[in-house]
Curated annotation (Swiss-Prot):
<dbReference type="GO" id="GO:0004497">
    <property type="term" value="F:monooxygenase activity"/>
</dbReference>
<feature type="transmembrane region" description="Helical">
    <location>
        <begin position="3"/>
        <end position="23"/>
    </location>
</feature>
<protein>
    <recommendedName>
        <fullName>Cytochrome P450 monooxygenase verL</fullName>
        <ecNumber>1.-.-.-</ecNumber>
    </recommendedName>
</protein>
<keyword id="KW-0479">Metal-binding</keyword>
<dbReference type="GO" id="GO:0016020">
    <property type="term" value="C:membrane"/>
</dbReference>
<comment type="similarity">
    <text>Belongs to the cytochrome P450 family.</text>
</comment>
<comment type="function">
    <text>Cytochrome P450 monooxygenase; part of the gene cluster that mediates the biosynthesis of 11'-deoxyverticillin A, one of the dimeric epipolythiodioxopiperazines (ETPs) from the verticillin family that act as mycotoxins. 11'-deoxyverticillin A is required for normal conidiation. The nonribosomal peptide synthetase verP is speculated to be responsible for condensation of amino acids to form the carbon skeleton of verticillin, whereas the cluster-specific tailoring enzymes are involved in further modifications leading to the production of 11'-deoxyverticillin A.</text>
</comment>
<dbReference type="InterPro" id="IPR017972">
    <property type="entry name" value="Cyt_P450_CS"/>
</dbReference>
<feature type="binding site" description="axial binding residue">
    <location>
        <position position="446"/>
    </location>
    <ligand>
        <name>heme</name>
    </ligand>
</feature>
<dbReference type="InterPro" id="IPR036396">
    <property type="entry name" value="Cyt_P450_sf"/>
</dbReference>
<feature type="region of interest" description="Disordered">
    <location>
        <begin position="520"/>
        <end position="544"/>
    </location>
</feature>
<dbReference type="InterPro" id="IPR002401">
    <property type="entry name" value="Cyt_P450_E_grp-I"/>
</dbReference>
<dbReference type="Pfam" id="PF00067">
    <property type="entry name" value="p450"/>
</dbReference>
<comment type="pathway">
    <text>Mycotoxin biosynthesis.</text>
</comment>
<dbReference type="GO" id="GO:0005506">
    <property type="term" value="F:iron ion binding"/>
</dbReference>
<dbReference type="GO" id="GO:0020037">
    <property type="term" value="F:heme binding"/>
</dbReference>
<keyword id="KW-0408">Iron</keyword>
């Protein structure tokens, strides 16, 4: 009999809480922004549970209700900012009260309160953010270019020798992962079979599943966390504890080994070594916190860059004219005697346009980032209560027909006259002229924008310079149409699809071979102390 009552408890507790809230209702709530009507008790929970549909739905709601609208999930309020001006006025100009995070019990437990992206706005968040800024500012980010140059040369060689038309999906992830691991820890990830690569994939998979909107009931109804037995809510605590244990063991093993190497004087040059030497002395933080701070770079640098690069390839297959446009520009500016370099960027507006258009066309996540208010506020006559989740609705902004002609079409020429970097575009006075919002807004904007910009540019420029790209064919010669669906989880990473890469000429293929051979002989020029972790060495680093 007692067991039979368990399913009733969550509903009963929720109803009691709702009755209490209605009894003490704030009259200012009459001035909430307009929005779609929800169901009793659960509000818009069912509408928002399917993240794949939310991309279109959030745009449709913005069209119907305007630049700011309201949804509700259980007792939790969300306000969606669907215009550049609304984002600027609230997230940018009022960052002191629009920079926290909505309550997310699952995400918090998976991270044990250590992941920077999900920390509430406060002293701990500011301390870690300031430490990371030293590694991610414009000047410091430029010192990482030798790493990105080296890894992109290997990626070209890997694609040239790929065993099938699917392998590029993983090659792009290896490139992204090895780049950010070298920057962060001074450890390369040279192969897809490398133990460290498998460890990072494990963490990325946990992170993506834990943060998938609508995946965890407890994150949609946080007030049930300490009320309802977890076995009625997907055993979320057990899952979160298991994932945190695995993730923290990997991160702490990497961190502790580097600290030991620093003491012995054998540590490679990397961001974390500099952080330990300088910033941690001034702002001491716990080892676990430092390890997860480094992990924040790895998760973002691996996941988001992979997503963008695979979306570039998808765009090539859906809109083959962009390949022709890129080839024409590269042949004119670079020629066939060498591959593109960072110094070519000012003369490659079409390539820059491909990078920017990719991030507008398919932003990195299925739903824009949610901040949270720490005080009551008003905007254009609308009341925004303290504790409200405030979503940067980038799908409404990026797909706005008034700003972008045929917005669902991939068109790099939109940016041919745009000479600003993403960081410069974020800071310009007129928010309506910003290139895209994929790097966020306000005090929680992406601190790695400079590294991301460089990683995308050099890879995109060289991939287009080196290869023709076509839709693959099956054994009968039938063309295989690529899927536009996304993988499960928070990110808008496309499901794996085939693409046929072919070197543009024997000369291009020879240059790829020669440059990669030279790169291996030379090492990463300008990256002193770099070492490549061997499988044997990494077994001492890996937790498993």
């Amino acid at each position: 009999m007692a067991v039979a009552l368990f399913p009733i408890l969550p509903i009963g507790c929720l109803l009691i809480y709702i009755i209490f809230k209605l009894w003490t209702r704030d009259e200012r709530l009459k001035h909430l922004p307009p929005g779609p009507k929800g169901l009793p008790v659960i509000g818009n929970m069912l509408d928002m549970a399917d993240t794949d549909k939310m991309m279109k739905k959030s745009k449709d709601w913005a069209d119907e209700y305007g630049e700011i609208f309201y949804t509700k999930v259980g007792l939790y309020n969300f306000v969606w900012l669907s215009s550049p001006n609304a984002v600027r006025e609230l997230m940018d100009k009022k960052g002191s009260i629009y920079s926290s995070r909505p309550p997310s019990p699952m995400i918090n437990m998976v991270s044990n309160g250590e992941r920077l992206n999900f920390l509430p706005y406060g002293h701990k968040w500011r301390t870690i953010r300031n430490i990371l800024h030293s590694a991610l500012n414009l000047e410091t980010s430029s010192t990482y270019k030798p790493v990105q140059d080296f890894e992109s040369k290997q990626a070209l060689w890997e694609i040239l020798h790929a065993k099938d038309d699917m392998e590029f999906n993983d090659i792009n992830r290896r490139y992204s992962t090895s780049t950010i691991m070298t920057i962060t820890y001074g450890l390369r990830v040279p192969t897809l079979q490398h133990p460290l690569y498998q460890d990072i994939l494990t963490i990325v998979r946990h992170f993506s599943l834990a943060t998938a909107p609508g995946e965890w009931v407890i994150d949609m109804v946080p007030m049930l966390a300490d009320i309802v037995p977890q076995f009625l809510l997907q055993n979320w605590k057990n899952v979160a504890r298991k994932w945190y244990k695995e993730d923290s063991e990997i991160y702490l093993a990497l961190y502790n080994k580097l600290m030991d190497d620093i003491k012995r004087g054998t540590a490679p040059d990397c961001f974390l070594k500099d952080m330990a030497r300088e910033k941690l002395k001034k702002n001491p933080i716990a080892d676990t916190t430092a390890a997860f701070a480094a992990g924040a770079l790895i998760e973002a640098g691996s996941d988001a860059t992979t997503t963008a690069l695979n979306n570039v390839v998808l765009a090539c297959l859906l809109y083959p004219e962009i390949v022709k446009g890129a080839h024409e520009e590269l042949d004119r500016v670079v020629g066939s005697d060498r591959m593109p370099e960072f110094s070519d960027e000012p003369n490659l507006p079409y390539i820059r346009g491909i990078a920017k258009e990719t991030l507008r066309w398919r932003a990195s996540t299925k739903v824009g980032p949610a901040h949270a208010t720490t005080q009551d506020d008003w905007y254009n006559g609308y009341f925004i209560p303290k504790g409200t989740g405030v979503v940067l609705n980038w799908w409404a902004i990026h797909m706005n027909e008034k700003r972008w002609k045929d917005p669902e079409r991939f068109d790099p020429t939109r940016y041919l006259e745009d000479t600003l970097t993403e960081a410069e575009s974020m800071a310009q006075p007129n928010p309506e002229l910003r290139d895209h919002f994929t790097f966020g807004a306000g005090r929680r904007n992406c601190p790695g924008v400079h590294i991301a910009h460089n990683s995308l540019f050099i890879n995109i420029a060289r991939i287009f310079w080196a290869f023709n790209k076509q839709k693959s064919k099956d054994a009968d010669g039938k063309i295989l149409e690529p899927s536009t669906a996304a993988q499960p989880g928070f990110l808008l990473t496309p499901v794996k699809f085939p693409c046929h890469f072919e070197a543009r000429s024997d000369k291009h293929a020879r240059i790829i071979e020669e440059r990669w051979t030279e790169a291996q002989e030379k090492g990463i020029d300008g990256w002193k102390g770099k070492k490549e972790s061997s499988s044997e060495e990494n077994r001492g680093v890996s937790s498993r």
